[in-house]
Amino acid sequence: VVLKAGLQPCPPIVVGVGIGGTFDHAARMAKQQILRPFGQTNPEPILADMEKRLLMAINSMGFGPMGTGGDTTAMAVHIDYAASHGFMPVAVALNCWINRRTGARLHNDGTVEWFE
C-alpha cells in the first residue's frame, strides 16, 4: 500500500493498520492507530515485532522526507487487531508528517479542558 501510494501522502508518514473484525471495524482501528503516540510500544509482542519489521521495510524503500530520498519514509507503524470469523479484513491508513493529536473534556458549565 505504501509503495503504491508513493509520495501522495507527503512522507514521512504514519501507517495505521487494522486487522480483523468487520471491514468497517478494521478501517476504524487503522485510523485510530494513526493517533497512537509515537514511541508507544504495542503490548502484544507479535504485533510489536511486526510494527518494527514493517517500519524497517517501508523505510528501505528510499522515498525519504517529501520524496527527496533517504531512509525516513515512515516515522511509525501502529497495528491493532480484533477477533474475526471466516475472513480476515485488513485496512491500512496513511497520514502525512504533520500529524496532530489532542483531546478535550467538555464540562457542563461550558468550560473546556484541553489535554494531549
Locations of the language-model features?
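Non-transmembrane, aqueous-exposed alpha-helical and coiled segments at domain scale
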Residues: 1-116
